C-alpha cells in the first residue's frame, strides 16, 4: 500500500523535498519517468495534462513539454537532463522556456529499493534563492503541485501495475 506523500519545506529554505513510497518495483517506478507516453498519464498537479513537444532523455538531452492547466492556461516547460543513473537517480535543470519563464531550478529524484517490490522516491527541488522558492510556491502552487503529482504517480502505478509492467516489457 502506497503511503501518503510528505513535503519538507523546513530543512532548507531554498529547497522543496517530496517523498513517497510506492507498491511497485524500483525499475518500474524509474521507467515511468523515461517515456513521454507514461509521463502524460501522471505528470503534474490534479487537473493538468501534459503534451510532449520533444523528448531526449540522456545526459545533456532536453524534454520540452506544455502543461495544460484546468483553467485553460498553458505552461511551457523545459527540462535539461544533467545526470541519469538507471533505476537510481535522475537530475535535471527545470524551468520554462527562457523567454517566457526564466526561473531555473535543479531537481534530483532518487529511487530507493525498499525490497518486496516497494520503492521510495525522494524528489528534491533546489531553487536559486529562498525568495525564488517562495515566489514559485505563491505563483504556481508548487508545494501543493508536488504532493498532487506524487499522488497521481502513485495512482498511476497502483491502477494496474501488472499491465504497466507488461506494457514496458513489450515496448508499448
Which residues fall in each region the model found?
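Hydrophobic ligand-binding cavity/cleft-lining segments
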Residues: 1-49, 172
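Intrinsic-disorder/low-complexity, polar/charged segments enriched in Ser/Thr/Lys/Arg/Asp/Glu/Gln
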Residues: 13-19, 50, 62, 76, ...
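Short beta-edge strand/loop motif at the mouth of beta-sheet-based domains
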Residues: 17-18, 37-74, 165-172
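Hydrophobic/aromatic beta-strand elements that line small-molecule binding cavities or substrate pockets
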Residues: 20, 52-55, 77-83, 94, ...
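A short, structured loop/turn motif at beta-sheet edges
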Residues: 26, 57-58, 82-88, 110-120
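Hydrophobic pocket/interface hotspot
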Residues: 29, 39, 63-65, 81, ...
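Helix-adjacent hinge/juxtasegments
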Residues: 62-96
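Beta-strand/loop substructures that line and gate deep hydrophobic ligand-binding cavities in soluble
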Residues: 97-147
